[in-house]
């Protein structure tokens, strides 16, 4: 059983945390995030040790689940507003490329038409070259969600490995048909 919820979360320098009712607001150099936690858990800021402490009232299963979840979300918020999150995507395939036009990501990945995806306002998307896409933001969930949506437009296929993949992702290549003699 995980006891991650019992660990306090240290507040980095340059980050402010404010709690009102069930709303947690975190502000730092990369941006501002807010989260409304469940009533099963309690969140408090210990100003002496400069830590966020998450506790729960009951010991029933949902309370234990939300205890660890809330602690992990608060920790991700603190890292996000301080350092930010980043996902890198690679586009593999002949003629496959990406570009940015205004607030739209344009992808040519083997379909008859170009695919257009609107970039969320809280994210920064760049294309260092035509075969790489870099997604940055302070919210870990929205960075990962947008990266997953882009990857799902053309997942890597198992025979040649063409498609959109995360940087460093290993695609298992299947052998083709073997000719019999």
Swiss-Prot record:
Pfam families given in the database record: Ribosomal_L6
GO (cellular component) term, any one: cytosolic large ribosomal subunit
InterPro entries associated with the record: Ribosomal_uL6-like, Ribosomal_uL6-like_a/b-dom_sf, Ribosomal_uL6_a/b-dom, Ribosomal_uL6_bac-type, Ribosomal_uL6_CS
Molecular function as annotated in GO: rRNA binding; structural constituent of ribosome
Keywords: Ribonucleoprotein, Ribosomal protein, RNA-binding, rRNA-binding
Alphabetical GO biological process terms: cytoplasmic translation
Claim: Ribonucleoprotein is one of the keywords in the record: yes
Gene3D superfamilies membership: Ribosomal protein L6, alpha-beta domain
Coiled-coil residue windows: none
Complexes and interactors: Part of the 50S ribosomal subunit.
NCBIfam families: L6_bact
Record family assignment: Belongs to the universal ribosomal protein uL6 family.
Function description: This protein binds to the 23S rRNA, and is important in its secondary structure. It is located near the subunit interface in the base of the L7/L12 stalk, and near the tRNA binding site of the peptidyltransferase center.
Protein name as annotated: Large ribosomal subunit protein uL6
Native species: Rhodopirellula baltica (strain DSM 10527 / NCIMB 13988 / SH1)
């Amino acid at each position: 059983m995980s006891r991650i919820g019992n660990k306090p979360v240290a507040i980095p320098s340059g980050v402010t945390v404010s709690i009102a009712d069930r709303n947690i607001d975190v502000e730092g150099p990369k941006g501002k995030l807010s989260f409304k936690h469940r009533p099963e858990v309690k969140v408090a800021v210990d100003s002496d040790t400069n830590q966020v402490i998450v506790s729960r009232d009951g010991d029933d299963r949902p309370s234990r689940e939300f205890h660890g979840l809330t602690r992990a979300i608060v920790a991700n918020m603190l890292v996000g507003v301080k350092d930010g999150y980043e996902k890198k995507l690679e586009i593999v395939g002949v003629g496959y490329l990406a570009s940015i036009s205004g607030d739209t990501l344009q992808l040519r990945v083997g379909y008859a038409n170009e695919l257009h995806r609107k970039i969320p306002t809280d994210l920064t998307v760049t294309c260092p070259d035509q075969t790489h896409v870099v997604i940055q933001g302070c919210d870990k969930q929205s960075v990962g969600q947008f990266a997953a949506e882009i990857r799902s437009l053309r997942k890597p296929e198992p025979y040649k490995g063409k498609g959109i993949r995360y940087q460093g992702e290993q695609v298992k290549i299947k052998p083709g048909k073997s000719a019999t003699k």
